């Protein structure tokens, strides 16, 4: 399946920042790419333009695609299962997996970025986490982390969980956090522990060029992403 699951070591650490920059870089290279968020919480319908799905839609060049990108949207800024329950709904992992597989199939040889909610072990349903969805999809992972103090422990913990589940880690991205230690210094300290996982840095701001990350992923994950259907 031509999909890459974008997950993180936690919430609000830069997944969408990285996804948007990656989408732009892939499009510049002529690759066919799309984005899908199986579920999003903390979504304000009165301010949809400021949401993560809207940012992804803009990066794709289709600002109207917000609802297509994120079919399950809930208001409360809580874990998706709780946010859904507050609106009288129950999330079913199989439904989200089926939707993601269908979206990937529509692209044929393109690449679908599936952006999770929260971190690797964040709950999606009452009994299942993002890791369960990753395993069900069988997709490689792009692991995004912040550069704050303590991030090395969080990255290594996430990698232990992913590798124990036999998940392929395509790359690790350190997304620059506000008021954090030096980004390069954090990367240098982390690199020896990654056991071969490629490491990339994502400075803050829209000017970051994810070209090197895009080139790596096209070669490692989606070598046929130039022949899909947009």
UniProtKB/Swiss-Prot annotation:
- Which keywords appear in this protein's UniProt record, sorted alphabetically? ATP-binding, Biotin biosynthesis, Cytoplasm, Ligase, Magnesium, Metal-binding, Nucleotide-binding
> Which top EC class is named for this enzyme in its record?
ligase
Q: List the disulfide bonds.
A: none
Sorted alphabetically, which Pfam families does this protein's record hold? AAA_26
User: Entry's InterPro entries?
Assistant: DTB_synth_BioD (IPR004472), P-loop_NTPase (IPR027417)
Q: Which cofactor does it need?
A: Mg(2+)
Write down the EC number.
6.3.3.3
Q: Where are the transmembrane segments?
A: none
Q: In which pathway does it act?
A: Cofactor biosynthesis; biotin biosynthesis; biotin from 7,8-diaminononanoate: step 1/2
- Which reactions is this enzyme annotated as catalysing? (7R,8S)-7,8-diammoniononanoate + CO2 + ATP = (4R,5S)-dethiobiotin + ADP + phosphate + 3 H(+)
One Gene Ontology cellular component annotation held by this UniProt entry: cytosol
| Active site residues according to the UniProt entry | 37
Q: Where in the cell is it found?
A: Cytoplasm
Top-rank taxon of the source lineage equals Bacteria
Q: Name one GO molecular function term.
A: ATP binding
Binding locations of ATP: 12-17, 52, 115-118, 175-176
Give yes or no: UniProt keyword ATP-binding.
Answer: yes
Q: Which family, according to UniProt?
A: Belongs to the dethiobiotin synthetase family.
Q: Which HAMAP family match?
A: BioD
- The protein in question is named ATP-dependent dethiobiotin synthetase BioD
Organism (species): Caulobacter sp. (strain K31)
């Amino acid at each position: 399946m031509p999909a890459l699951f974008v997950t993180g070591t936690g919430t609000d650490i830069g997944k969408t920042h990285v996804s948007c920059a990656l989408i732009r870089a892939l499009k510049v290279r002529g690759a066919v790419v799309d984005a899908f968020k199986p579920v999003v919480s903390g979504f304000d319908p009165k301010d949809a333009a400021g949401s993560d799905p809207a940012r992804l839609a803009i990066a794709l060049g289709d600002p109207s695609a917000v609802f297509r990108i994120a079919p399950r949207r809930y208001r409360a800024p809580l874990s998706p299962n709780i946010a859904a329950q507050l609106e009288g709904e129950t999330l079913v992992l199989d439904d989200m997996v089926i939707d993601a597989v269908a979206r990937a199939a529509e692209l044929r040889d393109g690449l679908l970025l599936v952006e999770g909610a929260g971190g690797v072990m964040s709950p999606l349903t009452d009994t299942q986490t993002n890791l369960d969805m990753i395993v069900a999809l069988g997709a490689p992972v792009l692991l995004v982390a912040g550069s704050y103090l303590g991030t090395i422990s969080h990255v290594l913990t996430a990698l232990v969980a992913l590798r124990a589940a036999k998940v392929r880690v395509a790359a690790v991205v350190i997304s620059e956090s506000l008021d954090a230690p030096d980004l390069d210094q954090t990367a240098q300290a982390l690199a020896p522990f990654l056991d071969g996982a490629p490491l990339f840095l994502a400075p803050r701001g829209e000017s970051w060029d994810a070209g090197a990350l895009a080139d790596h992923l096209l070669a490692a994950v989606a070598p046929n992403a130039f022949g899909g259907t947009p």
